[in-house]
Amino acid sequence: MTSLVPGAGLLPIPTSSPLTAVSSLGVSLSSLGAIPAAALDPNITTLGEIPQPPLMGNVDPSKIDEIRRTVYVGNLNSQTTTADQLLEFFKQVGEVKFVRMAGDETQPTRFAFVEFADQNSVPRALAFNGVMFGDRPLKINHSNNAIVKPPEMTPQAAAKELEEVMKRVREAQSFISAAIEPESGKSNERKGGRSRSHTRSKSRSSSKSHSRRKRSQSKHRSRSHNRSRSRQKDRRRSKSPHKKRSKSRERRKSRSRSRSRDKRKDTREKVKERVKEKEREKEREREKDREKDKERGKNKDKDREKEKDHEKERDKEKEKEQDKDKEREKDRSKETDEKRKKEKKSRTPPRSYNASRRSRSTSRERRRRRSRSSSRSPRTSKTVKRKSSRSPSPRGRNKKEKKREKERDHISDRRERERSTSTKKSSGDRDGKEKVEKSTTPVKEKEHSKESDATVSKAADEKGSPRTEDEGKVQHNGNCQPNEESPCSKADAV
């Protein structure tokens, strides 16, 4: 906040000495500091040699003189220093026009601008640079800016102010006259009535009664006009009633003026009230519009949030669909893999099939060996023939043999399944199996060739004579000849 104090240009400055001016402010010289003698000397030559700062290019040329007459005063205590103190302090240098305090009041230090009436007082003021003002040394320098002054009064503005003042004076007079009016008005009316009746009686006595009856209205008007003239003459002669009547007229005029003014005031107040009501209505409409805008903004925000939620749900649904598609693809790939595996299994015979073939081949070999053993021992057949009555029928024997073969085949199948479900064996064991199978194949071929020779003898033995008890024991126990290696023993070893 800045404050402007007018100097010599606006208010009269007392012509007291600088010491008395400072003492009137209540500021001691010891607190302000010693004033250098060079500053008080009017014939200073050295101070005029201080160079002035260059001005900016955009400075108004009409303010150059003001800038040259202005001084910057800094390092002022914002709590104790006032514009009046600065004004009184710099009056000892020269005539001061304006003093403006500047800077923030809340800060500990402030600064000010002092404009002198004469440019010659500027170098004197510069001599105070470093002088103690209160508890701080002053910093004085040339100013780069002019003091911003209030606008000067134009003749039109002055005339408006005079009119307003005169209106106020007239209103005051009207109020005073209205207060005095009821007493003076009654007395004036009584005196006026008496004077009028006296003049009328004189005029009536001079004129005749019969002539009044015959006269026309026009003549009566002319007489009344003459009467008014005579009345004016009488009023001029008598000074006191004339003055009273003029006062009453002025009062009446003042009343009419006051009434007209009151009417004007009422109309103005009504107009102002209407304008205020319109402004209030506009403000209400604006507030409503603002509330509507806020509601629209809120609705827009809600719509955006809903759209975001919908988008999130759509993204989730898309992700779910993608997951489902992936699962379907995985299922399809699994199905295709299973189909391929099944096709491969259908192309390659299963191990159980090979095991069944092996079991069948082993049963065939056993049959062949039995037929060979029966052909080699013909003596036993004779004993069998003798004891045919005790042995059972050949049909029952064939059934028992079939059951035994089935049981053996079933056992061999179980063993092979157990082998297949167990851990896979090394490649060396598989090679060993293949070698064993290769070694057994020529034996099988030899036995097959012998089988064709022994079929005839076997058929004859089955028809002619039953088997011996030794053969029954061999079949029941499943033993093989000691000379040849049985496939069942090989399978057990494997």
UniProtKB/Swiss-Prot annotation:
GO molecular function ontology, one term from the record: RNA binding
UniProt cross-references to InterPro entries, sorted A to Z: Nucleotide-bd_a/b_plait_sf, RBD_domain_sf, RRM_dom, SREK1_RRM2
Biased composition (Basic and acidic residues): 183-192, 263-340, 404-474
Keywords: Isopeptide bond, mRNA processing, mRNA splicing, Nucleus, Phosphoprotein, Spliceosome, Ubl conjugation
GO cellular component, one term: spliceosomal complex
Localization per record: Nucleus
SMART domains with a match to the protein in the record: RRM (SM00360)
Location of region: Disordered: 176-494
Complex and partners: Homodimer. Binds SFRS1, SFRS2, SFRS3 and SFRS6. Interacts with the spliceosome. Interacts with SREK1IP1.
Full protein name: Splicing regulatory glutamine/lysine-rich protein 1
Annotated source species: Mus musculus (Mouse)
Gene this chain is encoded by: Srek1
